[in-house]
């Protein structure tokens, strides 16, 4: 992302778009993927059979983690979730998160966040209205950074909900279709998860994915 000088060193690795560390699990309610990037930075637990996971980083973190549950292959299907999320003292997101293989892209639909809005330092693409709220939409180019293929240059897409929430249904197609007007491939998906990410501060989250 494009960041202010104050965040530059802090975010050096925060948005380094981790390569996945997949755990394939038995298929239940469609969930077949566990995202556990640097989950050892906190207390990460999950149960794929119930679609639940939790992450506690109450001792504080100073580098990036991304954890969650989802699918080995993403899609535009809607996701319904509920969460308890506390991250007011942390740079963190509660988001739908995933990758497109080609053209390579990393994406976030941010439902709630801590003390940092990613669109505050990225290129604005306008707004999109979905699921009862306006979302700020922005993009950035990450050059020679860690990705799902090792080190590469790729585009990030963000939709950030203005009326933040911790439960509801995310109509992913609305975001994909809007991003597609700005170069998003909208096909050839890699993994997709309901995720919690943080890279500093303290916080906690408990998430249930119901569809």
Curated annotation (Swiss-Prot):
Molecular-function GO terms, alphabetical: endo-1,4-beta-xylanase activity
Residue positions of the active site: 106, 197
Pathway recorded for this protein: Glycan degradation; xylan degradation
Cellular localisation: Secreted
Main location group: secreted
UniProt note: pH dependence: Optimum pH is 4.0.
InterPro entries membership: ConA-like_dom_sf (IPR013320), GH11/12 (IPR013319), GH11_AS_1 (IPR018208), GH11_dom (IPR033123), Glyco_hydro_11 (IPR001137)
E.C. code: 3.2.1.8
Temperature-activity profile: Optimum temperature is 60 degrees Celsius.
Catalytic activity: Endohydrolysis of (1->4)-beta-D-xylosidic linkages in xylans
Domain called GH11: residue spans: 19-210
Annotated GO CC locations: extracellular region
A Pfam short name: Glyco_hydro_11
Keyword Transcription recorded: no
Keywords associated with the record: Carbohydrate metabolism, Glycosidase, Hydrolase, Polysaccharide degradation, Secreted, Signal, Xylan degradation
Residues making up the signal peptide according to the UniProt record: 1-16
GO process annotations (BP): xylan catabolic process
Source taxon at top rank: Eukaryota
Function: Endo-1,4-beta-xylanase involved in the hydrolysis of xylan, a major structural heterogeneous polysaccharide found in plant biomass representing the second most abundant polysaccharide in the biosphere, after cellulose.
Homology family: Belongs to the glycosyl hydrolase 11 (cellulase G) family.
Protein name, as recorded: Endo-1,4-beta-xylanase 5
Gene behind the chain: XYN5
């Amino acid at each position: 992302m494009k960041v202010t000088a104050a965040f530059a060193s802090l975010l050096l690795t925060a948005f380094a778009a981790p390569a996945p560390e997949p755990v394939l699990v038995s298929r239940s309610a469609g969930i077949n993927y566990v995202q556990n990037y640097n989950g050892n930075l906190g207390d990460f637990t999950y149960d794929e059979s119930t679609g639940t996971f939790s992450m506690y980083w109450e001792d504080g973190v100073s580098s990036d983690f991304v954890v969650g549950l989802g699918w080995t292959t993403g899609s535009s299907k809607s996701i319904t979730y509920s969460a308890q999320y506390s991250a007011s003292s942390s740079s963190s997101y509660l988001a739908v998160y995933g990758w497109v293989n080609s053209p390579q892209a990393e994406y976030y639909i941010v439902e709630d966040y801590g003390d940092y809005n990613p669109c505050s330092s990225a290129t604005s693409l306008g707004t999109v209205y979905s699921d009862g709220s306006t979302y700020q939409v922005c993009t950035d180019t990450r050059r020679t950074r860690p990705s799902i293929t090792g080190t590469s240059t790729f585009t990030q897409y963000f939709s950030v909900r203005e009326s933040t929430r911790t439960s509801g249904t995310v109509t992913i197609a609305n975001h994909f279709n809007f991003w597609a007007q700005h170069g998003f491939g909208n096909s050839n998906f890699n993994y997709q998860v309901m995720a919690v990410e943080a890279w500093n501060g303290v916080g906690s989250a408990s998430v249930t994915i119901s569809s």
